[in-house]
């Protein structure tokens, strides 16, 4: 039987925010990613580097938006807006640094297996373990691609954001 207090506790730490990214900006980033940006098959990372088990752990393409690149500042502004909303509820949450921004693109049959995001140095982190994960949803015109966090499925809308702690209590996946 599910413990109601546990569900409430989890929900307290998972922030879902609508309309963080405008529809127009979502479309521009998606168009740029489809037609200009070089996405490549994602590789699953561990604390020791790339995993030999990547194909069973993840099937998607990804690419990084780095400072100075087109749309980087737009993405950063939206990220900071989502973070600010999260911090309004969680006053002790402080974000001093962040990595560049990764775009994940799932095609038919794509997935990311259940995992947590607290891997030191896996994606350019140079200041310790990540404290928060923030996801910006750029589209919702697809079937499947269900986002699951802490064993609960979230319905996400284009332009929305989800923010949650990057620790063992919040494993997540895309199915």
Residue ranges and their predicted role:
Residues 1-161, 169-175:
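Fe(II)/2-oxoglutarate oxygenase catalytic core
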């Amino acid at each position: 039987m599910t413990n109601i207090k546990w569900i409430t506790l989890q929900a307290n730490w998972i922030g879902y925010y609508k309309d963080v990214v405008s529809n127009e900006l979502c479309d521009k980033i998606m168009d740029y990613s489809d037609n200009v940006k070089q996405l490549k098959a994602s590789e699953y990372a561990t604390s020791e580097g790339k995993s030999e088990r990547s194909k069973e752990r993840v099937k998607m393409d990804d690419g990084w938006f780095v400072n100075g690149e087109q749309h980087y500042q737009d993405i950063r502004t939206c990220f900071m807006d989502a973070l600010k909303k999260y911090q309004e509820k969680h006053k002790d949450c402080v974000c001093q640094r962040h990595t560049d921004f990764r775009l994940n693109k799932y095609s038919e049959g794509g997935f990311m297996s259940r995992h947590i995001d607290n891997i030191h140095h896996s994606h350019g982190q140079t200041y310790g373990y990540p404290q928060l994960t923030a996801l910006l949803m750029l589209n919702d015109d697809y079937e499947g691609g269900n986002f699951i966090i802490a064993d609960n499925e979230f319905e996400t809308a284009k332009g929305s954001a989800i923010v949650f702690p990057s620790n063992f209590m919040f494993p997540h996946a895309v199915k």
